[in-house]
């Protein structure tokens, strides 16, 4: 096995200069304009310690997994999807994928947009996990159309595994149309990844039929995070409708600090408010550890690469600020194994410069402290280079042949739209 050592939490970036069509790779020190943007981005985080103040620990290895493939067996590049583990299977829901067949250029539109949202659901079955067809251990398969998400062309969905089902909230339809739907995926039988989606009836939580009151979000929301906590689902942050917003990406939306929860055992179903986050954020992730909900990084109108972390013990007060991450990031790979929460890569936008961060960092929930992480990357039989420098995919923790791993399926190597079908898998230190 060929390997190479990765430098922890460096800020080498692949950067697209908006409006110029040029690509810059490497440290952004070559021009005054880029250096000025670096200074502006750094000014926003002076309240936190410098990167060099964080200790470095060594451990963990990146490898490549099976590539994503669509229903026709083609490699399927995908980003901005939801990734959820249910009954040991990994589900990819929504996201941007290449239009098939590719759109042809015209005089009016010589460079047509090549991507669209999708309702196709892909499933990965870990090695050593007993499963019924169509599951194939160690491979991705496209589920039968009856198991696809009920709305086509979806992306930035918020989804969570909760009490034996997948709950999916909001998201964007088409280019960036707002949605407030709530859909639940129920497996058909034990050991099978196949199932059906349905809206949720308010009165008893069953499948909602035409003419019945179906559960929706209080307001459309996308790109937030959700966790399962006991009988509740907590939905946090994200973007909500707002005209003439200062958002640097989309002036029809703004980030929110809103936190709401749903107790799926209390009927009629009803969304309730929880304490708001200290900082609004979207394109972030969250985990549950030691009886607390932890939210990490993300972006908002102040910064597109937040360092901030917050945690809350439900029904025991509000959010507690935690130590800032060494490097701010949004849309980064994030997942927990044991007491450690790992964060890799991410996206940033500063002035007219966008890019991805090459960063490996780890948070210990027992000590409430961050470290930089020096990892190893295998280059054979498949090259795992770039695992710690992508965005648009949120890590999930899987168990394969009895070993806990972090999977990062798809995503993008550069900012905005640059999806890949590569799947990267991180083997944490200590197995």
Regions found by a protein language model. Give the residues of each.
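Cleavable N-terminal signal peptides
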Residues: 22, 33-34, 39
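N-terminal secretory signal peptides
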Residues: 1-11, 22-27
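Kelch-like beta-propeller repeat domains
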Residues: 37-431
């Amino acid at each position: 096995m060929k390997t190479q050592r990765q430098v922890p939490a460096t800020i080498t970036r692949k950067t697209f200069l908006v409006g110029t069509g040029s690509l810059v790779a490497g440290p952004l020190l070559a021009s005054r304009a880029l250096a000025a943007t670096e200074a502006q981005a750094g000014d926003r985080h002076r309240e936190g310690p410098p990167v060099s103040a964080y200790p470095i620990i060594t451990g963990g290895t990146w490898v490549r997994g099976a590539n994503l493939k669509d229903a026709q067996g083609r490699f399927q590049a995908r980003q901005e999807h939801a990734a959820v583990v249910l009954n040991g299977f990994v589900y990819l829901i929504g996201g941007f994928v290449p239009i098939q067949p590719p759109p042809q250029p015209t005089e009016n539109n010589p460079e047509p947009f090549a991507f669209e949202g999708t309702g196709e659901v892909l499933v990965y079955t870990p090695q050593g996990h007993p499963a019924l067809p169509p599951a194939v251990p160690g491979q991705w398969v496209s589920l039968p159309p009856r198991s696809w998400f009920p709305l086509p062309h979806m992306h930035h969905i918020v989804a969570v595994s909760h009490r034996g089902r997948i709950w999916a909230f909001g998201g964007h339809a088409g280019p960036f149309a707002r949605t407030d739907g709530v859909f639940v995926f129920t497996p058909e039988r034990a050991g099978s990844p196949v199932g059906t989606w349905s809206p949720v009836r308010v009165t008893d939580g069953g499948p909602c039929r035409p003419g019945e009151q179906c559960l929706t979000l209080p307001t459309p929301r996308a790109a937030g995070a959700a966790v399962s906590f006991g009988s509740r689902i907590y939905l946090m942050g994200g973007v909500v409708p707002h005209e003439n917003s200062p958002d640097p990406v989309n002036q029809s939306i703004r980030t929110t600090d809103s936190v709401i929860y749903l107790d799926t055992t209390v009927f009629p179903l009803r969304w309730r408010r929880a304490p708001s986050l200290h900082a609004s954020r979207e394109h972030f992730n969250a985990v549950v550890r030691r009886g607390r909900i932890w939210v990490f990084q993300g972006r908002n109108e102040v910064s597109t690469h937040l360092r901030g972390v917050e945690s809350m013990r439900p029904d025991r007060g509000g959010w507690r600020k935690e130590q800032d991450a060494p490097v701010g990031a949004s849309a980064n790979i994030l997942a927990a194994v044991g007491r450690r929460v790992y964060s890799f890569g991410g996206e940033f936008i500063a002035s007219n410069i966008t890019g991805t961060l090459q960063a490996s960092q780890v948070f210990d929930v027992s000590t409430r402290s961050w470290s930089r992480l020096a990892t190893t990357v295998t280059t054979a039989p498949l090259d795992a280079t770039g695992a710690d420098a992508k965005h648009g995919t949120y890590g999930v923790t899987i168990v394969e042949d009895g070993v806990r791993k972090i999977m990062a399926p798809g995503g993008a190597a550069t900012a905005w739209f640059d999806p890949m079908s590569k799947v990267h898998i991180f083997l944490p230190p200590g197995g």
